[in-house]
Amino acid sequence: RLGLIGFGRIAQGVAKVAQAFGMEVHSYDPYLPLSVAKKVGVTMHKNVDNLFKTCTHISVHCNLTDETHHLINQKRISMMPGVDPFNLKCGNHIVNCARGGIVDEDAALAALNSGQLTSLALDVFEHEPVDPASPLLEHMNFHGTPHIGAATIEAQHRVGLDIAEAVLTVLQGGIADTTVNRDALS
């Protein structure tokens, strides 16, 4: 079971790929109505703790806010089941390509060391650049990239298209889909 924290465009794309591989997908996003997830066959949880209790794989797709700082901590990692719906041991896995600081790196390292967490993949760190002496970097079940997860030709092409579409929308008198202060403009 894959749990997605945040269920915007990127998370919805991840959900489609996971479903194509036969994964059961769950999500938590306090800002989206349940109908958004239901429409694409994803189970939306109203409580983030329930997501951790249900899923062995967590992928982060939310912004860093006061509420999401260290959202993934020792307490929540310990809630993860480590077994799939067929009661087969598959371990617990976390991926964060969203924002540094959402994962409590010390808690994640302790969970890796204890075996509660099977693998951790980070493209973002709480403090960047990450300290080269960090014990996290030496752990055999840690996979990291230096905040370059979106540095692909395809991703940069998509960003260019998104910007062009937003500019065109505004020039035609509309409000761009990516506007973060929509309320202030109305």
Residue ranges of model-derived segments:
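Residues at the starts of beta-strands that form the adenosine-phosphate
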Residues: 23-24
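C-terminal helix-to-coil terminal segments
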Residues: 78, 126-186
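Aromatic pocket-lining residues of Rossmann-like dinucleotide-binding sites
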Residues: 18
